[in-house]
């Protein structure tokens, strides 16, 4: 999705897409997007990067499968930390990917964090 600076793009639901990922808020312009579920297919996950929105913009957690952020912005926390709210479907997908034989570096192992 491409848009001019300072505007919000719109995701389009497409057949065969299994993850819709987008930022809740664009840091440099402050443009925010509503947190809402995309995709009608039951396996389609909605993943939201909330690094510059967490704690500052209300949202309905049931509208996303993964809402993740690093606390160094809105929470003035140390860098290098990462938090995520994950639905059961997202956790199940993480384990499925980990069990698929795909190489995942240990420092990127989501299942190690769960």
Show where each model-derived region lies.
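Active-site phosphate-binding strand-loop segment of PLP-dependent enzymes
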Residues: 3-51
């Amino acid at each position: 999705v491409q848009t001019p600076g300072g505007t919000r793009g719109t995701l389009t639901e497409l057949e065969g897409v299994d993850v819709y990922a987008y930022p809740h808020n664009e840091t440099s312009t402050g443009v925010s997007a509503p947190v809402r579920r995309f995709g009608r297919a039951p396996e389609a996950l909605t993943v939201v990067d909330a690094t510059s929105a967490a704690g500052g913009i209300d949202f309905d957690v049931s509208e996303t499968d993964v809402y993740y952020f690093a606390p160094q912005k809105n929470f003035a926390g140390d860098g290098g930390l990462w938090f995520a709210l994950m639905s059961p479907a997202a956790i199940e997908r993480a384990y499925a990917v980990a069990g698929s034989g795909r190489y995942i570096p240990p420092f990127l192992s989501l299942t190690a964090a769960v």
